């Protein structure tokens, strides 16, 4: 189908976003045509503002508009504990729980030999430097419960063993409200391994 050039460019731009295929891109482009101009300009300004003003915290790697980020600046947080996550979205998920009060370290990925991503391609060296400079007593490995996340956690755990810092791994288990019969074997196994005394 042939579209006027501005619409074709907009469709192509939308298709660069993750999870947006041709049909959704076309639908979004035509929706933009129905929007008021000031709404479109505000949307475009928001995109530019995010790109210009959001960066990664030089301490932990989380997204921020100030450096260091609000978490690293907060003196009320437990500075003896660092939770290591793969992605800034993981920090946001952890913060929503309102149960963790320590600091974070964002790796920006996970070790994945199949994709050519090694330890040097993620922020492990920065983590090791932080651990030398700060009085950390515990590192919580909260990488994803998949092959890459587990490999990354094991790699970091082995690196930290000689330091004497306590290294823990978040337990992976059944979702609240989930039925045992619908859980896969790995989830059940991890739930059993991560059990705690009541």
Swiss-Prot record:
Question: GO biological process annotations for this chain's record?
Answer: DNA recombination; DNA repair
Keywords assigned by UniProt?
Answer: DNA damage, DNA recombination, DNA repair, Metal-binding, Zinc, Zinc-finger
Q: Report whether Metal-binding shows up as a keyword of the record.
A: yes
Q: Known Pfam families for this protein?
A: RecR_C (PF21175), RecR_HhH (PF21176), RecR_ZnF (PF02132), Toprim_4 (PF13662)
- Give this protein's Gene Ontology molecular function annotations: DNA binding; zinc ion binding
Q: Which InterPro entries match?
A: DNA_Rcmb_RecR (IPR000093), Rcmb_RecR (IPR023627), Rcmb_RecR_Znf (IPR015967), TOPRIM_dom (IPR006171), TOPRIM_RecR (IPR034137)
Residues forming the Toprim domain are: 80-175
Xref: PROSITE patterns: RECR, TOPRIM
| Cross-referenced Gene3D superfamilies | 3.30.60.80, 3.40.1360.10, 6.10.250.240, RecR Domain 1
**TM ranges:** none
Query: Where would I find the C4-type zinc fingers in this protein?
Result: 57-72
Q: Has the keyword DNA repair been applied to this entry?
A: yes
Its domain of life reads Bacteria
Role: May play a role in DNA repair. It seems to be involved in an RecBC-independent recombinational process of DNA repair. It may act with RecF and RecO.
Q: Family membership, please give it.
A: Belongs to the RecR family.
The protein in question is named Recombination protein RecR
